Amino acid sequence: MTTAQQTLAQPPAPAPRSLLTERPFRLLYTAAAVSKLGTAVSSLAIPLVAVVALHADAAQVGLLATLSTVAFLLIGLPAGAWVDRSPKRPVMIAADLVRAAALGSVPAAWALGRLTFAHLCAAVLVSGVATVFFDVASLSNLPELVGRDRLTEANAHLVTTDALTQIGGRTVGGLLLAAVAAPAAVLVDAASYLWSAACLLRLGPGTTPAPRADRRAGIRQEIGAGLRFVWRDPVLRPIALAGGCTNLSIQLSQTVLPLLITRELGLPSWVLGLFFAVGGLGVLLGSRCARPLARRFGAGRVLWLMGLAVAPFGLLIALVDRGGWLWAAALGWLVTTFKVGIDNVVKVSFRQAVTPDHMLGRMNATMRFVLTGALCVGSALAGLLGTVLGVRAALWAAAVGLALVWVPIARSPLRRVRALPGT
């Protein structure tokens, strides 16, 4: 039996009370909620800064979107190796301060009349690099903060908060942008990172000392060790494959749906916004139902059973059209994102539960590299299929991918796992 399987075989310890009543997790939860809310605001504000204040064209706006995520592909794997050598919370605090400075420079330069598109790109890229380190360190810090027996509960709270801030943050952002100029709205995100850093400072440096990584091993060797660890582990490999397939398929849909709904079907843009808002609701509901469903059906079993049950609903998305088919497609999108919410809780908890402390950074970085890479491939594939075969063909390809995401889990030891720590 592997180390991962031995970890999963251990019975979960009872959780006496909600994690939200415990100060350390409450501080982390508050930091995450505030910074995610700020990020949701700036996701609207930054493109508007480019368009309204700097008169950017479509290619420049696309470049900004690319710069916000490309850091995971460029430095994600080295960041994981570096985080494994370092205490996690100081890394998170430093990343928050860097993000606050980078984004805070945008309204400052605008107020002085010195803001340029190059400055905006640099701020987005620097913030993206800091986000890589923050996310990897945050995922790696959670087992230390709450204990491995309460990971599912902790992740359920965090994923729910993420979904709520995605829904509410864009609403707040829209109202804020109606009241102030877009560059000033970016200041909200910068302030949210300062708030997050202040909360993390109150947590202290952490009780677990920095792992004593073999300093004779270079970063390249440590990256290779992380890749091999994920690929050879019977729990992590199917999670990576299923997650990559899910992300690729979701991104295929999200890329072409705006073209199909607004251009080919001629529906107003608010319909598209409402359609995607349904997806945010699905993630929220899935994250809240993850623990009870895992208890009812088994933590491993719920992953592949939900994937199998959701498969037909991906076909409804591909059938989107005017009238009743629009409602059917919205139902398909709701159910599909409901599964994503469950996955975000259960899969992340599995990942954290089976990985030794000294490998957490590299494991999380490898997973983020795979998942972000799948998003990039999905975007490129959507463009290729949409150009050659039409946007409807891209939706059918996404439906096929969504119909297959349960296979890696069903063919792995996860299919027999009933209890995950904290469920």
Protein language model annotation of sequence segments:
Residues 2-423:
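Alpha-helical transmembrane-bundle signature of multi-pass membrane transport and export proteins
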